[in-house]
Amino acid sequence: MNGLLRARRSLFAAVAASVFAAASLPALAQNAPVAPAPATTPAQPQPAAEPPKWPDFNTVVKDMTPMPGLFTIYRYKAEDNSKDQTRLLCQIPRALMKQDLLLATSISRGAQAGFQWDDYLVRFEIQGKLVVIAVPDARFVTNAAQTVNDAVSRTYNDSFLTAMPIVTYAPNGDPVVEMGGPLLAPLVNLPAPSGPGAAFAPRREMSTFPKVKAFPDNVLIDADIALAGRTGAGMSVGLTYSFRRLPAIGSFTPRIADERVGYFTTVRQDWAIKYTERENVIRYVNRWDVKKKDASLDLSPPEHPIVFVIEKTVPLQWRKYVAEGIAEWNKAYEKLGIVGAIVVQQQTDDNEFANVDPEDSRYNFIRWIVTGRGFAMGPSRADPRTGQILDADIIFDDSMLRFYFREFDTFGPAPVAAMMGPEFTTFLVEHPEFIPQGMTLDQVKDAARSLTGQGELLHESPMAGAQPTVDGAPLSHRLNPSRTECNYAVGLRQQLAMAHLAVAASGKKIPDRFIGDVIREIVAHEVGHTLGLRHNFKASAWLSETEIKKRRDTTDEPLVASVMDYNPVVYFAGDDIEKLRHFITPCIGPYDYWAIEYGYKSADKGGDEKAMLQQVAGQSSKREYAYATDEDTVGLTSVDPSANRFDLSDDPIAWSKSRVALCDALLKNIKTWAVKGNEPNYYLRSTYLTVMSHKASDMMYVSRLVGGQYFNRNRSGDPDAKPALQLLEPKRQREALDMLAGSIFKDDFFSTDAALLNDLPPSRWMDWYSNPISRIDFPAHQTVQSMQSFALLALVSPQVLQRVYDAELKSKADDKFTAAELISRVRNIVWGNLTQPGETKFTDAKPMLSSIKRNLQRQYVSYMLSIAESKPGALVSADLQSMASYSMEELSDQIGKLLAQANGQIDFATKAHLSQTKSQIDRTLNAPHMQMPGFGGGQIIIIGQPTGANQQQK
């Protein structure tokens, strides 16, 4: 761009100089002597005709077929192999220059087929012998009528995607450009495997354009891009470009967003807003242009309905449920007087949709794909100037409905990172001393990289990270923030797997109608995203467990406030699958109706839309309208224990107890039902891990109560407004600690049945489909450690300790849950009372402290010493650090007294553990702190400092 600017300046200087010279000539001539005119003027020779500036248009497009549309495309017939099939000429009307267009890209073939990819607001601009695809910065409002406009344009100038050479001009003056090369370059990053030796480069000579279509308002170009690898192996990826004319400004009325209602937003900054306003940022709701065709009618069809086409790839047996999931949202629009806001069509081989391309941005498709991962996603594209949604496509992976016997390491690095969010993984990378046992720093770094820039979705189901990838390529992509990468179906697939096991234990199977209900729920969830709605992870905390069971068994009412939560299947220990009325929430809930009202309700004729929206959003303090989304549920940094994934009911402790009861019932006789006589034993291993992973991960809901604070989005002027943050009652936090102490921190929470543990071999298949495990015997200790370490970190992490400590100033009650109490109680839970063994003499086979308890204690001490030895203020306040240090000093003293008085009654393993723990505590707490010059006053703790003449201590 700098070169083009320099060229413009040079051209301006040359033109100015010539104009100046021409204007000066008459003035100079007036002062010069006038020569007499000759009698006759000899004939001057005529200059030779200049060659044409551009090649002849007809010659350039000879043998090419024109395809008129938004712009005219010229290409050779596909069957003519004598021609360059990568050559694609485009005649761009001059009237289209500098007009706003949407360039949307999609993956049409390959592992990510069906994914919406990158999209841009673009403009065509002629610059010399080039047509540039410029990308204006849509974040900033420009208005030529405002005096600040020049400053805005100068500061936030355009970027560009590519420059296309002009090859000729059409007879009407339109430039004709070569677009084939730039599109095959390509214009966006492609989903290709990464890693050593996996770099891929595009090969134009091997690439093609399988499909090109031009329409009056859009052009679709499908490219098959060949990619060559360093090792000689290659691959191809289908990438579809769709250029689309954007609606005229003024044809759609943007709607101001409100943080109390969960919508995706389009955010713009307007520097012309008055200085008296608190912000110069405008946030628009992302929504369709859906309104009554006749506003005078109580019930009217929409002026522009939203049309979804179910792709013919959707299996026949599930089409009914897919259609019902889409149409479910019509109920919310009907309450606003709009009938048939959403229209569902079915694509077949011979109807009017037979040849419609799902990548065509004019159509909204529900697509069926087969990646092997089992997920669904509902992204949409919105006008970056107004938030008007223009296009949406939902993809549904077939594997969602297939129960695979895979090992799901729910507490491995990837799934833990997925569950806890990017802030948690960043914390572990920066403070590796807090990495739980069973993880490595490299694994955490890999997990952190996989979460970078995932758009709306900040973390997944805990099971998601344990899923296989396809062709070595991760299925997550850095999507445009206006879209969502939703992993509801990934986690729900694990819910189905668990339900499958529970039903199989009773000798039955899940009826197809319940599978259909799950499909309907997932589709409704993803369609909600395409309507503009974000996740609402508070919706499942609306009703009590008793009310949920009553509704499930006797009514068709919603079981949760919104389908935009990650809602679990509703199956409890003792349920008879054949007698259930519902298996999952059957319909949209009250929050969904309310959110659609905010986004799509029209003000009465002559009414004040701002006042109408305030009246709607002002109801947010109602229990059924509570809202929390992705950024409210990012693990250790999230305060609200009512915002969770795959929980149910208003009581996390009761819900966790129900899930543990179900898991215990399955574990009791697992060998009798998990594997049939002719099935391999590794099915038993995967079944056991699935049940145990669910049992342990359900403790997450309980641990979040400790240090919890309810976050309310209502405003102070709303009816029945609550404080923005409400501390949980101390009694409730103590109940949570009591439950954790009696469950996941006890040995008997984990199955120690030797016969079972000796019957859990891994699969030994060594092929592309399998994930071979090198260790054949079952890693019992590692499995327990990973589950306990994660639960422990949720109680003693610096974030939780600091939050509990700060909360002491936020309550005037006599009874407070303090940081001192938390530190003391957790230490007592893990270590208990280190009393003398009495008359008991422990042996190596029957130790005083079990191996499970020793590992838990070791992890606890590691966490607490990491806090104690950190730089004051780096992890927690100095006051908290003092408490952590003193707690460790007390523990060291208790261990010392026990060792001194045991008189040989303690077994070898316990004695080694206690001795090493005391030594570690004493060495860390008594290490000298040295002030090092040049390090800004920081401290370095030297452990095991040698003695010598040069030793200096401070």
Language model regions located:
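Bacterial N-terminal signal peptides
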Residues: 13-24
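Bacterial N-terminal signal peptides that target proteins for export
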Residues: 2-15
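The catalytic-center signature of Zn2+-dependent metalloproteases
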Residues: 346-369, 517-524, 529-573
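Zn2+-dependent metallopeptidase catalytic core
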Residues: 97-98, 317-341
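Sec/Tat signal peptide C-region and signal peptidase I cleavage site
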Residues: 25-29
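Conserved catalytic/binding loops enriched for acidic/polar residues
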Residues: 458-493, 509-514, 539-954
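Short pre-active-site segment immediately N-terminal to the catalytic Zn-binding motif
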Residues: 314-318, 505-523
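Auxiliary tRNA-acceptor-end handling modules of aminoacyl-tRNA synthetases
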Residues: 30-314, 332, 336, 347-510, ...
